[in-house]
Amino acid sequence: MRRRPRTSALVRNQRGATLVEFGFVAFPLCLVIMGIGDLAYQSYLNAVTKGVLDRAARAASVGTLNATQIDSFISNQMSTVMSKQATVSVVKTSYYNFSRIGKPEKILTDTAPLGSYNSGDCFEDANGNGTYDTSSGSAGLGGADDIVYYQVNVSMPRLFPMAKLLGWPATQTATSSVILRNQPWANQAAPAKVCS
């Protein structure tokens, strides 16, 4: 006669219970750890981008770096904290004064219809290209005493492969901008008056 195994012995057996409990907790725990790591790296990338841009802009405002050197400086400094697939773009726009940032070139003599540029109007050619522009800025570092707007965009793949799981984009970006006035190492060139 064969004895039947006692099921009560299996019910009382506690060996391996921790492994089963850890199995329930492991996946959410890994997600939380990777999520915190991803958010922490994003904050770190933003802080480094801001610091590098501030240093480059300060050096450019006193004439230490030219436009090409700024791009190289920022790329070299950022290469230590970003992946090989990352892209860095630097935008430099100069303005004659603070009040002209983001505004069209100033109309000096306005003919009908008033309030908008049309043929026969005279305007202050702030960017020196000889045509009326809806943005008075010009690309580059400008000259002495000019206002320069710097913007850096860094885009790279995320460190952890969990972006799709949480609905995040597969790439992370860091953007930083700063506005500085160049030092007055010479007289500021006044914008020309152009009439059409």
Provide a role label for each language-model segment.
Residues 2-3, 54-196:
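Short, conserved structural patches
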Residues 1-78:
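Alpha-helical assembly-interface signal, strongest on the long, hydrophobic N-terminal helix that forms
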